[in-house]
């Protein structure tokens, strides 16, 4: 247990924030570069959300409070539910139309 607590001496808050900013940047890059495929867009948004969760966990460790970690777990749970619903809708749309490109989805009328 003491070895885990001593690990924070080597990994500072700056390391967590740099990692978070890199993951967020990769998500933004994926979002802007792959605009045609909805699956790539969803994965990029999930990466950006994970970067925000890394920030919550890092600041909760730095402030020595559990609220950020609990909030991060709640966010991950809700995001998993949203993603599963979104993928189910996309699967049904793909079975009906045969394509999940953004240009085809934009032409959808209700």
From Swiss-Prot:
<feature type="transmembrane region" description="Helical">
    <location>
        <begin position="13"/>
        <end position="33"/>
    </location>
</feature>
<keyword id="KW-1278">Translocase</keyword>
<feature type="transmembrane region" description="Helical">
    <location>
        <begin position="41"/>
        <end position="61"/>
    </location>
</feature>
<dbReference type="GO" id="GO:0050136">
    <property type="term" value="F:NADH:ubiquinone reductase (non-electrogenic) activity"/>
</dbReference>
<keyword id="KW-0812">Transmembrane</keyword>
<keyword id="KW-0874">Quinone</keyword>
<keyword id="KW-1003">Cell membrane</keyword>
<keyword id="KW-0813">Transport</keyword>
<keyword id="KW-0472">Membrane</keyword>
<dbReference type="GO" id="GO:0042773">
    <property type="term" value="P:ATP synthesis coupled electron transport"/>
</dbReference>
<dbReference type="Pfam" id="PF00420">
    <property type="entry name" value="Oxidored_q2"/>
</dbReference>
<keyword id="KW-0520">NAD</keyword>
<comment type="similarity">
    <text>Belongs to the complex I subunit 4L family.</text>
</comment>
<dbReference type="GO" id="GO:0030964">
    <property type="term" value="C:NADH dehydrogenase complex"/>
</dbReference>
<keyword id="KW-1133">Transmembrane helix</keyword>
<comment type="subunit">
    <text>NDH-1 is composed of 14 different subunits. Subunits NuoA, H, J, K, L, M, N constitute the membrane sector of the complex.</text>
</comment>
<dbReference type="GO" id="GO:0005886">
    <property type="term" value="C:plasma membrane"/>
</dbReference>
<dbReference type="GO" id="GO:0048038">
    <property type="term" value="F:quinone binding"/>
</dbReference>
<dbReference type="InterPro" id="IPR039428">
    <property type="entry name" value="NUOK/Mnh_C1-like"/>
</dbReference>
<protein>
    <recommendedName>
        <fullName>NADH-quinone oxidoreductase subunit K</fullName>
        <ecNumber>7.1.1.-</ecNumber>
    </recommendedName>
</protein>
<keyword id="KW-0997">Cell inner membrane</keyword>
<dbReference type="InterPro" id="IPR001133">
    <property type="entry name" value="NADH_UbQ_OxRdtase_chain4L/K"/>
</dbReference>
<feature type="transmembrane region" description="Helical">
    <location>
        <begin position="73"/>
        <end position="93"/>
    </location>
</feature>
<comment type="function">
    <text>NDH-1 shuttles electrons from NADH, via FMN and iron-sulfur (Fe-S) centers, to quinones in the respiratory chain. The immediate electron acceptor for the enzyme in this species is believed to be ubiquinone. Couples the redox reaction to proton translocation (for every two electrons transferred, four hydrogen ions are translocated across the cytoplasmic membrane), and thus conserves the redox energy in a proton gradient.</text>
</comment>
């Amino acid at each position: 247990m003491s070895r885990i607590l001593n690990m924070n001496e080597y990994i500072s808050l700056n390391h967590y924030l740099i990692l978070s900013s890199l993951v967020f940047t990769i998500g933004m890059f994926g979002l802007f570069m792959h605009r045609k495929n909805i699956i790539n867009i969803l994965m990029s948004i999930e990466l950006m959300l994970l970067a925000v969760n890394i920030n919550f966990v890092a600041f909760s460790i730095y402030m020595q409070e559990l609220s950020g970690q609990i909030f991060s777990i709640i966010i991950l749970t809700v995001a998993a539910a949203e993603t599963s619903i979104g993928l189910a809708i996309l699967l049904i749309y793909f079975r009906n139309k045969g394509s999940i490109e953004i240009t085809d989805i934009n032409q959808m009328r209700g």
